[in-house]
Curated annotation (Swiss-Prot):
Quaternary context: Monomer. Binds 30S ribosomal subunits, but not 50S ribosomal subunits or 70S ribosomes.
Source organism of the structure: Salinibacter ruber (strain DSM 13855 / M31)
Function: One of several proteins that assist in the late maturation steps of the functional core of the 30S ribosomal subunit. Associates with free 30S ribosomal subunits (but not with 30S subunits that are part of 70S ribosomes or polysomes). Required for efficient processing of 16S rRNA. May interact with the 5'-terminal helix region of 16S rRNA.
InterPro entries: KH_dom-like_a/b, RbfA, RbfA_dom_sf
Gene: rbfA
MF (Gene Ontology): ribosomal small subunit binding
Keywords (A to Z) from UniProt: Cytoplasm, Ribosome biogenesis
A GO CC annotation given for this chain: cytosol
Location(s), subcellular: Cytoplasm
Protein name: Ribosome-binding factor A
Family in the record: Belongs to the RbfA family.
Database matches in NCBIfam families: rbfA
């Protein structure tokens, strides 16, 4: 990616995040965070990675589908904010960023491993005490 496309990607990410926070916070529940953005070399498409916070997978999926349905509306608002900074307003394509969910799964896995080790250590100590 060229320096210009990187700057445009950063600008799009920042402005879309602001738009979501200020204009759509009440409509997009639970909270949506734009974690990353990439822009094609010709600046025609912006790929936005969104993390959706929610208690259930169904809730997160419904919010993400709603976000996708708002893409054109968000693009229009983006255009009014950045049209003087870029030659073309890119089409917005949203992707579900599961990195936070994956991190949570990994943390839970490590917790289970830690608990299993502690249990084995306790069992080992109990066995050693019984032999004495």
């Amino acid at each position: 990616m060229s320096v210009y496309t990187e700057r445009v990607a950063e600008l799009v990410q920042r402005e879309v995040a602001r738009i979501l926070q200020r204009e759509y916070a009440d409509r997009l529940q639970p909270m949506v965070t734009i974690t990353r953005a990439r822009v094609t070399g010709d600046l025609s498409i912006a790929y936005l990675y969104a993390s959706v916070m929610g208690d259930t997978a169904e809730e997160r999926e419904a919010t993400f589908r709603q976000l996708e349905s708002l893409a054109d509306e968000i693009r229009n608002q983006l255009a009014s904010r950045i049209r003087h900074k870029v030659r073309e307003i890119p089409e917005l394509k949203f992707f579900h960023d599961e990195s936070l969910e994956e991190a949570k799964r990994m943390e839970n896995l490590f917790d289970r491993i830690r608990e299993e080790r502690e249990r084995r250590l306790e069992d080992g100590e109990d066995s050693a005490d019984a032999r004495e």
